């Protein structure tokens, strides 16, 4: 297993009360696991009510997971009363799985050994970015405008999952559900939007102040799903 990461950031003065700053963080990790065990699923009951073993499979699972993530942000003062900031996030994780099962499947045959394999590759991706602005004292007045624009993408991609089973008649391929299948899946969601508000002061006295905020929000989201199965 391996995991590394790092960060880089700084800020600079641009003069006249303005500054620019940024921060970047990135990480990478890889993890490999192997699990073994015994699966005795779907037991039956004896006449006295005790559990009786129905299926018995020796199982082995190998998995390799990789994760990459990046986070960045930057902010700049355009003037003493106006600033813009940017945020971006990216994450991608993948899994490569191999599953092996061998033993007695009573629903197929109690007199022969059944062997099952499943290979699977799975990837998940997340991306998000946001741009924000804050503008004070517009036109030498006390008006304040704030706005935010954003976009995001989420995806789950399974480009290949295949399963096969052997048993009976000299370990021949079993023509049954879950054997000789290939499955593909792709789920994706996209979002983007914009939000803005204008702060308008009404009055300000020693006893208090009053203001009104006007604004609006727009958001669009769409999702697509594609599944295919071959046998």
Model-based region annotation:
Residues 1-99, 124-129:
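Transmembrane beta-barrel wall of Gram-negative outer-membrane proteins
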Residues 31-40, 85-106, 110-112, 155-165, ...:
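Outer-membrane beta-barrel and related beta-rich outer-membrane complex signature
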Residues 45-56, 65, 103-116, 167-181:
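Flexible, solvent-exposed coil segments and beta strand-coil junctions
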Residues 75-79, 83-86, 118-231:
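Face-selective signature of the C-terminal outer-membrane beta-barrel domain
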